[in-house]
Amino acid sequence: MKHLTEMVRQHKAGKTNGIYAVCSAHPLVLEAAIRYASANQTPLLIEATSNQVDQFGGYTGMTPADFRGFVCQLADSLNFPQDALILGGDHLGPNRWQNLPAAQAMANADDLIKSYVAAGFKKIHLDCSMSCQDDPIPLTDDIVAERAARLAKVAEETCREHFGEADLEYVIGTEVPVPGGAHETLSELAVTTPDAARATLEAHRHAFEKQGLNAIWPRIIALVVQPGVEFDHTNVIDYQPAKAAALSQMVENYETLIFEAHSTDYQTPQSLRQLVIDHFAILKVGPALTFALREALFSLAAIEEELVPAKACSGLRQVLENVMLDRPEYWQSHYHGDGNARRLARGYSYSDRVRYYWPDSQIDDAFAHLVRNLADSPIPLPLISQYLPLQYVKVRSGELQPTPRELIINHIQDILAQYHTACEGQ
């Protein structure tokens, strides 16, 4: 499992290559990603966050072992080789337990790390940047690094215990603002300064030395920084290379290190490519993929309404709206404004809080009903042209079957293709 260290080695040798990380637990998104990687014969990096998946189940109800089993079963069913599959854990640390005292939160974080590593996750993002209940705000670099080193030691010991060797690859540091898209309206974003990046690295190097972990430094492959990319509900802050030039040059002094960029969703293909060239060579993408899934489902729901009598329709959009109103906990602290603004955000926001609702049984039943309704007879081509014009071109050329499932998968793969192209290198 040396895909990542080899990618970093090639990048440092001037190949301008990278890798994208699929950050989603949705079965259709994962199927789209696995099939795309298979068709292009590339490794595939799939990541779970500490919110989605933890030793208690996270919001998906899955432990790390469950998530691995789910992904591997899907990969097997699609004949994707498991040695080309890399599993990563994102923002692993006390993130979920910030409301607890630090001692308790870090004990939970120890167990979180053990559960991820024991399940076979090989890319581990150590993030202890968040203050716990009895911590100062913000934490110093030294405290953050000491906690990360403690978790690295747990990870190394767990890996040796379960696999007989320590072959983990680490990412350190964090971006600002919080994971998953900004809550507020944005206009500009501060880029991480070279001094701040250096301070994070040196604090971690020192803390790792104190834990007797000098030997793992070459396996710390990336530092998470903010290159100046973010999105809110209706806007995207595009990458501006000039603003990140000093940061980009700084990492050239570290022979085994690149940058990892979070919240790259909705960047233009040109910006994604430039990020990789500028050494932000691990690109995280999540909401943009479930946003594409949602787009495809809304388009198919519109087609269904044209073809199927109202009483026989799935009513997917109304079911979705009803469930989101009944259980507002995943969106109400993110979406603001009057009733109409919040309604629009629930359906269309770039932050895509709707992604938390797809596993709901009522919504899943409506989705299955929609697919059944449209699978009974061929979807008329003019309706595909109207509602899924990019897929229509591929249907007409014979490269895409016009079934509901294939149209959804292909629409998601259009986003993956942008990331693949950005990461290919010279």
UniProtKB/Swiss-Prot annotation:
Pathway this chain belongs to: Carbohydrate metabolism; D-tagatose 6-phosphate degradation; D-glyceraldehyde 3-phosphate and glycerone phosphate from D-tagatose 6-phosphate: step 2/2
SUPFAM superfamilies, A to Z: Aldolase
Signal peptide range in chain numbering: none
Cellular component annotations (GO), alphabetically ordered: plasma membrane
Single GO biological process annotation from the record: phosphoenolpyruvate-dependent sugar phosphotransferase system
Superkingdom of the organism of origin: Bacteria
Protein's job: Component of the tagatose-1,6-bisphosphate aldolase KbaYZ that is required for full activity and stability of the Y subunit. Could have a chaperone-like function for the proper and stable folding of KbaY. When expressed alone, KbaZ does not show any aldolase activity.
Oligomer and partners: Forms a complex with KbaY.
Similarity field: Belongs to the GatZ/KbaZ family. KbaZ subfamily.
Protein name per its UniProtKB record: D-tagatose-1,6-bisphosphate aldolase subunit KbaZ
Species: Escherichia coli O1:K1 / APEC
Lineage: Bacteria, Pseudomonadati, Pseudomonadota, Gammaproteobacteria, Enterobacterales
